[in-house]
């Protein structure tokens, strides 16, 4: 918020804070405009990728939307935090966020009164996994016409075979970290029955 106040002439921190947190405004058109501007700068170039990752923000208390005791990758442990899934368009050393989705744990979506107290819109009071949020980011980028050659994810997403298969089904090229104990085939395996050794079947 402070950086915005520094960049916007004749702005006031408290007024901006009130506008962003208490005024009724749609954030999606603003986020989509950022995606369009990023695409105009680096979209469509050879090597441009859409990176998907999550990040956690440590919190005290229980009032912030989506706050819960959950995995905080920044700290490497379970902690009271909010978690967001982010999409960034990047090529070499040029990268910028183009989308963000707040993860709502089931303890939030199973408690409509808590959601209402925190002003969570009814349309957002649905539990979606982080993998589903990642898919929403990818689909939204394609819907907006953002031009990228591939999707990049870390092991938290790359270890989900279902997620990778959904990317393949959508025709997406992807680069994914996987866990070290994941078995993979470098070529399509052919069905094989070992020969009988003459013993009992």
Model-derived features: where do they sit?
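Active-site-proximal, Lys/Arg-enriched surface segment
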Residues: 21-106
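A residue-level signal for conserved active-site and pocket-lining positions in enzyme catalytic cores
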Residues: 4, 87, 174
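Gly/serine-rich nucleotide phosphate-binding loop at the start of the catalytic core
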Residues: 1-23
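Alpha-helix initiation and N-capping motif
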Residues: 1, 13, 27-35, 160
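An internal, acidic/charged active-site-proximal segment
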Residues: 112-201
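Alpha-helix C-cap/termination motif
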Residues: 7, 41-44, 144, 169-170
């Amino acid at each position: 918020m402070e950086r915005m106040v520094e960049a916007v002439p004749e702005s006031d921190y408290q007024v901006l804070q009130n506008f962003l947190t208490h005024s009724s405004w749609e954030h999606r058109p603003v986020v989509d405009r950022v995606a369009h501007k990023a695409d105009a700068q680096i979209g469509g170039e050879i090597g441009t990728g859409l990176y998907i990752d999550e990040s956690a923000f440590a919190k005290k208390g229980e009032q912030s939307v989506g706050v819960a005791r959950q995995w905080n990758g920044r700290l490497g442990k379970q902690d009271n935090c909010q978690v967001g899934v982010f999409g960034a368009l990047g090529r070499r050393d040029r990268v910028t966020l183009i989308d963000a989705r707040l993860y709502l744990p089931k303890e939030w979506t199973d408690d409509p009164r808590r959601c209402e107290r925190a002003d969570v819109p009814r349309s957002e009071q649905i539990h979606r996994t982080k993998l589903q949020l990642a898919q929403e980011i990818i689909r939204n980028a394609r819907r907006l016409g953002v031009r990228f050659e591939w999707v990049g994810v870390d092991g938290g997403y790359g270890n989900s075979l279902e997620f990778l298969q959904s990317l393949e089904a959508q025709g997406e090229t992807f680069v994914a970290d996987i866990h070290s104990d994941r078995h993979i085939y470098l070529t399509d395996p052919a069905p094989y029955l070992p020969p009988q050794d003459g013993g009992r079947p």
